[in-house]
């Protein structure tokens, strides 16, 4: 039987506010345990929450960016359950009435454009952390994270493969960073994902029973966990069994998912509107104010790059994958005042290669946009060849310095003096009479031999176009 | 000095008839002498009190005093007080020393008031008789065989026994008004949102409201002036100017429209109380008021709706008492579930557990619509009843409670009977309105209170209406025998 996979993702994006969603405590990551938690975060008797306006602004910004409806009135609810790192015994979240509803996101998978529905995005607070190591059999509680603002973004079950799920997640990841509402740091848990996965016989409209896989904190794990889960469910169904609705945890070491709790064991969260917080009213004036701060969004930027710089779909897609990359590229183009395609190549291929090798983000590049632009300028004005430029780039990366200094110091300037090139060619022809005879007898392949000899003699500095032209003339 | 009202004491301090230190010492001595028989204080804070009194005397000397500077008061033990045990009447918080002050406490401190201590109360404010306190019941100063009412029973008893001229209370379903009535004092539950709930340990967040308890309306006006006002730390606190309550006290009542809801005078009301309420209303007629019967048709739904909403909120509010970060923790827990169940099982008393169970049930999947949502709808119907009533009348009057103070144990075996003692007060909380109780006479030697209910933010009018009655009568000046000296 042929099976179809149905996936929906719930993504938790930590909002990049300075203070927590319901208290004034800072949200800084990595501080000493329990130093970023105030009385409100600790859930002391008598404390009350006050909503952070900035978190609302960010949620609205996101809603506008995905073309969603911004609820004029949304409600904070309490999700009640006991856990030691949940100080109040409930999480303040949104349930019936989320702040953002019915948006969409377009993704591109294998050249196919897909539109993925986003059911809702709601504001909520994060819990603290339970630390099970180093406490001699006890569990430590760190409440620094408690009360950190989260935007939970819930997709429609519109995804049909792990690949689509990852493409959606990457697109969302880029978007929240474009919007500057989330730092996207997956290692620190700023952007994490739960996946709802089910399979059904191809052609069936009814959904199969789903399993929810919790806490996937890298793109690679999302893909592996989903693929593993699909295989597990198909195996059960093909064996005549039934998938049970449950929550599963992905073990990245063993590359498998295992059961965490079944539907029957699931908590009854007893949601009800939080009486400490009034309904959140968002005026059209506030929405307009936020709208005015929206940056150019990834899709619009990609289309503009294609039109303005004449880039291919692929190049435009890669260069707009992050706002930082796009900004870097545009600075290079502006500074180099030249060929946008050449600039694209040097950003996407050569510089990205060095970044990947050192595991650095574009923002941490050892060569800034102006530096790369000056190198590109030297290629464009034929001071150096592309091949020499790679050498210069490596030196800039490893030792620092400007392109011009390196070219000067290492004498890498291209030989463009026709007379000089001609005299080198003359010497080579004179030194290789045999090869000359063979070439003239019709062995065209030997043209490369003469180019090689000339480049060797000039340490690669001969202008390749001029060299070709002159060689052809002289060899005739 | 203890015979004087808060307003009179303030005048005495201003005239230097006595110092705040003297006043404070006198009250501390009374507490030491009389409170063992009453049990109205959980904690006394003589050192803090004397330090505050000395500071107040300095302020008075410099001419920087306000009407509360140097005045002894006491806080219901539901308000967090920095560096002082804040127990909420529960074993759960027997060891809890708050690291911060409630807004109400801050404001009294800033006004220069002197805190004598923390007052006894029903556990987590859940009770109508003060019998649920972990620290034992408070005795009614009028008859120590009877309850003082609850949950602010310690506050009411301490004021009635002249241990303190004014005390704070909180009212979720009648917890200021009913004990005020049982103890023969004046108490005001302000409009929901008038006083900040910051630092007031939550029972039912959408109903809880702090208010003053004192001997006279004038004293309540002085206290409310300090307590009321916007606080950005409480999202449900209303940003609205606070009127000058004392200035409004003298307004005459000519043409005041009083409504008597027929539902407040039906079955279940002690006829002697009905008689005293009608007599008090007659007094208002003499003061120029116009009286008419009105109807609040959904009143009979208020107790059932309340006993869904309040327990639902409490079941969630009390989840933080889990033995993990503060409060009672059981000995040697074997695992997490054991830590939770034993810490909570040992820390909470029976009434608190009953309400947590009711509330948990009411919010459960499959029951939410039938209970919680329906109760919220009833709440709207009740608010609507009041809204209509206030189109025709300025204030509503009726009994505060269906009976006078009952004997210990009389209702503790029957929770429903206990819950019905708040039958006239609960609707006011459900609607978020302000309500007062003032003494209007005695039945079997026990005080009877009359409730006065007004429209939203009409505290100034309620205080004015109560004050004019107190100018014309002397019920509020009566003092329990044996403690008068």
Swiss-Prot record, chain A:
It holds the Pfam family GatB_Yqey. One of its GO terms (biological process) is translation. Its EC number is 6.3.5.-. One of its GO terms (molecular function) is glutaminyl-tRNA synthase (glutamine-hydrolyzing) activity. Keywords: ATP-binding, Ligase, Nucleotide-binding, Protein biosynthesis. Disulfide bonds: none annotated. Gene3D superfamilies: 1.10.10.410, GatB domain, N-terminal subdomain. It comes from the Bacteria. It is an enzyme of class 6 (ligase). It catalyses: L-glutamyl-tRNA(Gln) + L-glutamine + ATP + H2O = L-glutaminyl-tRNA(Gln) + L-glutamate + ADP + phosphate + H(+); L-aspartyl-tRNA(Asn) + L-glutamine + ATP + H2O = L-asparaginyl-tRNA(Asn) + L-glutamate + ADP + phosphate + 2 H(+). PROSITE patterns: GATB. Allows the formation of correctly charged Asn-tRNA(Asn) or Gln-tRNA(Gln) through the transamidation of misacylated Asp-tRNA(Asn) or Glu-tRNA(Gln) in organisms which lack either or both of asparaginyl-tRNA or glutaminyl-tRNA synthetases. The reaction takes place in the presence of glutamine and ATP through an activated phospho-Asp-tRNA(Asn) or phospho-Glu-tRNA(Gln). HAMAP family: GatB (MF_00121). Heterotrimer of A, B and C subunits. Belongs to the GatB/GatE family. GatB subfamily. This is Aspartyl/glutamyl-tRNA(Asn/Gln) amidotransferase subunit B. The gene is gatB.
């Amino acid at each position: 039987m042929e099976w179809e996979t149905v996936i929906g993702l719930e993504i938790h994006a930590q909002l990049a506010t300075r203070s927590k969603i319901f208290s004034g405590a800072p949200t800084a990551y990595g501080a000493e345990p329990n130093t970023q938690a105030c009385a409100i975060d600790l859930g002391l008797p008598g404390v009350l929450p006050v909503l952070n306006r900035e978190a609302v602004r960010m949620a609205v910004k996101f809603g506008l960016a995905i073309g969603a409806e911004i609820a004029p009135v949304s409600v904070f609810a309490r999700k009640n359950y006991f856990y030691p790192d949940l100080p109040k015994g409930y999480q303040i979240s949104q349930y019936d009435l989320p702040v953002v509803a019915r948006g969409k996101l377009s993704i591109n998978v294998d050249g196919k454009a897909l539109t993925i529905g986003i059911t809702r995005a709601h504001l909520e607070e994060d819990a603290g952390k339970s630390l099970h190591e180093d406490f001699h059999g006890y569990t430590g509680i760190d409440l620094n994270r408690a009360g950190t603002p989260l935007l939970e973004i819930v997709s429609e079950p519109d995804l049909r493969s792990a690949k689509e799920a990852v493409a959606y997640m990457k697109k969302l990841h880029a978007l929240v960073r474009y919007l500057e509402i989330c730092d996207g740091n997956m290692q620190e848990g700023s952007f994490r994902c739960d996946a709802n996965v089910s399979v059904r016989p191809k052609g069936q409209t009814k959904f199969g029973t789903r399993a929810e896989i919790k806490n996937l904190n890298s793109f690679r794990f999302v893909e592996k966990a989903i693929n593993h889960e699909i295989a597990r469910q198909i195996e059960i169904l093909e064996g005549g069994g039934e998938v049970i609705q449950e929550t599963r945890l992905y073990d990245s070491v063993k590359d498998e998912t295992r059961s965490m709790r079944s539907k029957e064991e699931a908590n009854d969260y007893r949601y009800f509107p939080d009486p400490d917080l009034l309904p959140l009213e968002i005026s059209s004036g506030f929405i307009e104010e936020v709208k005015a701060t929206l940056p150019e969004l990834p899709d619009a930027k990609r289309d503009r790059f294609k039109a303005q710089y004449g880039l291919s779909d692929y190049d435009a897609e890669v260069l707009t994958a992050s706002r930082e990359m796009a900004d870097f590229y545009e600075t290079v183009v502006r500074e180099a005042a030249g060929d946008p395609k050449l600039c694209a190549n040097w950003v996407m291929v050569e510089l990205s290669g060095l970044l990947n090798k050192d595991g650095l983000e574009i923002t941490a590049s050892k060569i800034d946009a102006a530096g790369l632009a000056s190198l590109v300028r030297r290629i464009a004005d034929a001071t150096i060849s592309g091949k020499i430029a790679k050498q210069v780039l490596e030196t800039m990366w490893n030792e620092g310095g400007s392109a011009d200094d390196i070219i000067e110091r290492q004498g890498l300037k291209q030989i463009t003096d026709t007379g000089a090139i001609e005299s080198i060619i003359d010497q080579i022809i004179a030194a290789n009479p045999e090869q000359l005879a063979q070439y003239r007898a019709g062995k065209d392949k030997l043209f490369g031999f003469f180019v090689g000899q000339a480049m060797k003699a000039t340490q690669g500095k001969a202008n390749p176009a001029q060299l070709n032209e002159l060689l052809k003339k002289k060899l005739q | 000095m203890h015979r004087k009202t808060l307003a009179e004491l303030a005048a005495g301090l201003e005239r230097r008839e006595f110092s705040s230190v003297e006043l404070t010492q006198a009250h501390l001595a009374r507490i030491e002498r009389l409170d063992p028989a009453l049990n109205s204080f959980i904690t006394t804070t003589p050192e803090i009190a004397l330090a505050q009194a000395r500071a107040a005397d300095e302020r008075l000397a410099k001419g920087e005093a306000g009407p509360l500077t140097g005045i002894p008061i006491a806080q219901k033990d539901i308000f967090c007080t920095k560096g002082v045990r804040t127990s909420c009447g529960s074993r759960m918080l027997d060891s809890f020393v708050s690291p911060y002050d409630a807004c109400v406490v801050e404001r009294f401190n800033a006004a220069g008031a002197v805190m004598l201590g923390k007052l006894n109360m029903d556990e987590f404010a859940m009770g109508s008789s003060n019998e649920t306190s972990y620290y034992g019941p408070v005795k009614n100063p009028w008859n120590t065989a009877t309850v003082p009412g609850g949950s602010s029973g310690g506050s009411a008893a301490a004021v009635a026994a002249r241990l303190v001229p004014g005390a704070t209370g909180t009212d979720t379903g009648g917890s200021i008004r009913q004990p005020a009535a049982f103890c023969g004092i004046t108490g005001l539950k302000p409009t929901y949102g008038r006083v900040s709930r910051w630092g007031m340990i939550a029972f039912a967040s959408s109903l809880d409201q702090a208010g003053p308890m004192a001997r006279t309306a004038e004293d309540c006006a002085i206290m409310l002036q300090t307590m009321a006002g916007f606080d950005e730390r409480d999202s449900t606190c209303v940003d609205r100017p606070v009127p000058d309550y004392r200035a409004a006290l003298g307004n005459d009542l000519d043409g005041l429209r009083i409504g008597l809801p027929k539902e407040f005078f039906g079955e279940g009301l002690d006829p002697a109380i009905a008689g005293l309420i009608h007599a008090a209303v007659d007094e208002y007629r003499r003061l120029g008021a116009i009286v008419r019967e009105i109807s609040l048709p959904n009143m009979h739904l208020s107790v059932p709706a309340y006993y869904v909403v309040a327990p639902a909120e409490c079941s969630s509010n009390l989840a933080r008492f889990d033995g993990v970060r503060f409060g009672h923790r059981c000995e040697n827990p074997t695992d997490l579930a054991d830590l939770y169940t034993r810490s909570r099982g040992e820390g909470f008393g029976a009434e608190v557990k009953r309400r947590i169970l009711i509330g948990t049930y009411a919010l459960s999947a499959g029951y939410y619509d039938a209970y919680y949502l329906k109760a919220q709808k009833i709440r709207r119907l009740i608010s609507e009843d009041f809204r209509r009533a206030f189109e025709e009348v300025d204030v509503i009057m009726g009994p505060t409670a269906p009976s006078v103070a009952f004997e210990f144990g009389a209702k503790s075996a029957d929770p429903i009977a206990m819950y019905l003692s708040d039958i006239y007060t609960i609707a006011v909380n459900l609607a978020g309105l302000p309500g007062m109780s003032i003494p209007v006479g005695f039945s079997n030697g026990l005080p009877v209170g009359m409730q006065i209910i007004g429209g939203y933010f009409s505290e100034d009018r309620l205080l004015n209406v109560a004050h004019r009655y107190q100018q014309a009568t002397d019920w509020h000046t009566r003092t329990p025998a044996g403690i008068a000296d």
